[in-house]
A protein has these predicted regions:
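Core SAM-dependent methyltransferase catalytic element
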Residues: 169-187
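Conserved class I S-adenosyl-L-methionine
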Residues: 1-35, 38-46
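Conserved SAM/SAH-binding beta-strand->alpha-helix loop
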Residues: 67-69
Length: 187
């Protein structure tokens, strides 16, 4: 990721104009319980809303993000959260370490195989991000490489046992947006 991305996200997290939810993602609330307790990884954690929820549920959590400003919102709030400011375009995820991996509203296809390897046996992946849909024109444009293609998320994690998958409209940025959601277990 470019330094410009770090600057952009730091600016967004420091701005009072941008409002980021403090509530955990619905998909995390609905499926975290499938994972054995242990260490969770929150990729592109932003303000840490999902990590803080998981700590309340008994997990220790490692959070990764490009933005120091975003990580400051979660770092130090609980000793079970460890934050690391990293460039996910070059960072390598530790293999066979996590009982739960979250990837919410972020896409880096290079990480797909690493995410599979990061899970311990019985570990759970919860992944949800934006989807390019031919019948939808967003109010806020996204770069095509930041959008999943139809069925791409499902096909990207065939090594795991998929327990939930959907492609549907969901709320994002105050408007409906096509999202792909996946929950899968490493057997």
């Amino acid at each position: 990721m470019l330094n410009s991305d770090r600057i952009k996200w730091n600016r967004k997290y420091r701005s009072r104009r941008e409002v980021f939810s403090a509530h955990p993602s619905d998909i995390v609330c609905n499926f975290y319980h499938l994972a054995p307790h242990g260490c969770a990884l929150d990729i592109a954690a932003g303000n840490g809303r999902n990590a803080l929820f998981l700590v309340q549920k008994g997990f220790s959590v490692e959070v990764l993000d490009i933005s120091e400003a975003g990580l400051k919102m979660v770092a130090g709030r609980d000793p079970k959260v460890r934050a690391a400011c990293v460039d996910l375009d070059v960072y390598d995820i530790v293999p066979r370490r996590y009982s739960l991996v979250l990837n919410i509203r972020y896409l880096n296809r290079r990480l797909f195989p690493q995410i599979c390897e990061a899970l311990i046996g019985g570990g759970v992946l919860i992944f949800e991000t934006y989807l390019k849909h031919p019948n939808f024109v967003p109010q806020r444009p996204h770069r095509d490489d930041h959008l999943l293609r139809i069925n791409e998320l499902l096909l990207g994690f065939l090594k795991l046992e998929v327990v939930y998958y959907s492609e549907k409209m969901a709320a994002a940025f105050g408007e409906p947006y096509p999202m792909a959601s996946l929950v899968a277990i490493k057997r």
